[in-house]
């Protein structure tokens, strides 16, 4: 009771009162029905508890809404139900001032009442007190059937014999003390519809005996001529004396005259259900709107409980999607960062990095999407948690990448402020540059590390180096990807690991570092392919051994800056795959062992690129 604020008393009866209250938190009005238990018979107390139990289990759009119930100090049964602003039907008849209701409105009310009774009867519940004062109207003039104080749950034979109810609405079999069933409610409803149409009770007398005689003889005045014959026939069929020929609620709902109203009521109910459903996930048109990724960490609303569609699939399902609000885009950044961490935990190595040059997704039909632009290298078993770009529709060539600063870029990329690159934000940072599509997977200045197999020499011969330098003007080669195969392209990207402070002295260590930088042998003319087996324990052990040996050497020589760069990928909280640093160490180890085989003059021709 503490949750409700008392407003006024709106009704009073022989067993209790009805109070208008307001919920303190919801600010919504309800009706508090207080049924007095003190100084009442055992039957009355049992009926009060039965009403509280029955109404708490009912859920139907045309039955009063149940909110709460309790027993107050063992003196009152309190039932909180929905408030109907339109009052009851008896009040509506009085307010009509002799003006008859339209037949369409009466048919709508009749259909709603029949649906409510059909719900009760299908659950073996008899209302037993259907009358105009127990039929309530909402603000929208819809029906709510209430007051279940005399309701009864039927047994297996679906009949009862107790004489209860309001005499003017009692059926002949009840007055004759004959067991009755659900057809008694149909008789009472017929009396209500007659009263709503005629604006006077169907049966009225000065004494009880005269009333019983009228009911038994079914003596009623004809309905006004303004109502159609089928409607008057419906009311007459509900007032048949023999319950066996009296139609049920289901039979009446199938009557041809009521079919348009039945369909209209059902359509309104379906629309109401759609409005009350939980909101859907944001459409892809709102998710993929134009904006720039400029901040890595933002708080965005949750996508929903299921999240049955990934962000990449949303883009693929809606090729016409364009970017709009920054808040929606920040949600994507947050989501992709989660995917990157999840994928790296499964050992997935992503070997493609887009530079700060802008890229844009061009929209092509399904028939043209034949080349997959993502480049994913799996270490061990495949990760099912990585969300790939859909190959069946318009595909974005921007892939969640996780490169760290331990992977060097070229000078040109450095000049474009790649040093300030944020791995979480940058994956989709510049989605607006033109003329890039799945059919022309083109990447501007990408630093690619070709990983050689264990048995293959990773160094160039002098002839190969000269060929590489001559073909440096060739660019714009296509990118292909086949499991662990990487095909490199664009201009020759020399990557030199500058491990020596003094380069001008021409020491052997400087030559070795220059030669190690040439290990990324990307030739534009031949597009050389390199294969390796990431599941080979022998190769991994050898690479780790080389990493430890080279780290010890740097530590012994006091080259702490280079040691810091080498071991930085192994720090906590990193999302990039550590295999990159392992293979670099393997290259450095083999470089040291094969220094004598490298031509020093060729190594000096390689452009110097500082380690990022």
Curated annotation (Swiss-Prot):
GO terms for molecular function: ATP binding; protein serine kinase activity; protein serine/threonine kinase activity. SUPFAM superfamilies: Protein kinase-like (PK-like) (SSF56112). ATP binds at residues 10-18, 33. Residues 503-513 have a biased composition (Polar residues). Residues 514-527 have a biased composition (Low complexity). The active site is at 129 (proton acceptor). PROSITE patterns: PROTEIN_KINASE_ATP (PS00107), PROTEIN_KINASE_DOM (PS50011), PROTEIN_KINASE_ST (PS00108). InterPro entries: Kinase-like_dom_sf, NEK_Ser/Thr_kinase, Prot_kinase_dom, Protein_kinase_ATP_BS, Ser/Thr_kinase_AS. Signal peptide: none annotated. It catalyses: L-seryl-[protein] + ATP = O-phospho-L-seryl-[protein] + ADP + H(+); L-threonyl-[protein] + ATP = O-phospho-L-threonyl-[protein] + ADP + H(+). CDD domains: STKc_Nek (cd08215). It holds the Pfam family Pkinase. Its EC number is 2.7.11.1. Residues 503-534 are annotated as: Disordered. Keywords: ATP-binding, Kinase, Nucleotide-binding, Serine/threonine-protein kinase, Transferase. May be involved in plant development processes. Belongs to the protein kinase superfamily. NEK Ser/Thr protein kinase family. NIMA subfamily. This is Serine/threonine-protein kinase Nek1. It comes from Arabidopsis thaliana (Mouse-ear cress).
